[in-house]
Amino acid sequence: MRVYEGNLISEGKKYGIVVGRFNEFIGSKLLSGALDALKRHGVKEDEIEISWVPGAFEIPLVAKKMAKTKKYDSVICLGAVIKGSTAHFDYVSSEVSKGIANVSLDTEVPVIFGVLTTDNIEQAIERAGTKAGNKGYEAAVTAIEMANLLSEI
């Protein structure tokens, strides 16, 4: 029996990162966490490319453009959608989630969901490096594992 499982050491792999600028205070913390994880797992600076987009809604399109180039072994999507007093949150978070999943399935490149969808700013801050860890860091570790796993299969 053969079992496939990605490891967490990155050698010679390239990573694209897409970051939403809206709620930049949170996005920049997620990006810092992702970069920290990538570097700790052996990724060199010249193996990372970052694209900033206006907001979370634009993330799937740029992620798809990056994935279709086949330059990247994985694409990491980072940002924050924080609930307000209107239904806007529901529409944006739903479409971003579906869009990122579809990019991964359509391109067969791991596209990792590191977009926070929270009820308030406090929850976002907790998930961007305080009480609840850094979801950007976690997304980058997932990207490494998935890039390695797909290269094995």
Swiss-Prot record:
One cellular component (GO) term of this entry: cytosol
EC number: 2.5.1.78
Record protein name field: 6,7-dimethyl-8-ribityllumazine synthase
Pfam families, sorted: DMRL_synthase
The entry's keywords: Riboflavin biosynthesis, Transferase
Function: Catalyzes the formation of 6,7-dimethyl-8-ribityllumazine by condensation of 5-amino-6-(D-ribitylamino)uracil with 3,4-dihydroxy-2-butanone 4-phosphate. This is the penultimate step in the biosynthesis of riboflavin.
Gene3D superfamilies documented for this protein: Lumazine/riboflavin synthase
Pathway assignment: Cofactor biosynthesis; riboflavin biosynthesis; riboflavin from 2-hydroxy-3-oxobutyl phosphate and 5-amino-6-(D-ribitylamino)uracil: step 1/2
Domain of life assignment: Bacteria
One annotated GO biological process: riboflavin biosynthetic process
Family label: Belongs to the DMRL synthase family.
Residues reported to bind (2S)-2-hydroxy-3-oxobutyl phosphate: 85-86, 127
Sequence positions that bind 5-amino-6-(D-ribitylamino)uracil: 22, 56-58, 80-82, 113
Active site as annotated: 88
Catalytic activity: (2S)-2-hydroxy-3-oxobutyl phosphate + 5-amino-6-(D-ribitylamino)uracil = 6,7-dimethyl-8-(1-D-ribityl)lumazine + phosphate + 2 H2O + H(+)
MF-aspect GO terms: 6,7-dimethyl-8-ribityllumazine synthase activity
Species in which this protein is naturally found: Clostridium novyi (strain NT)
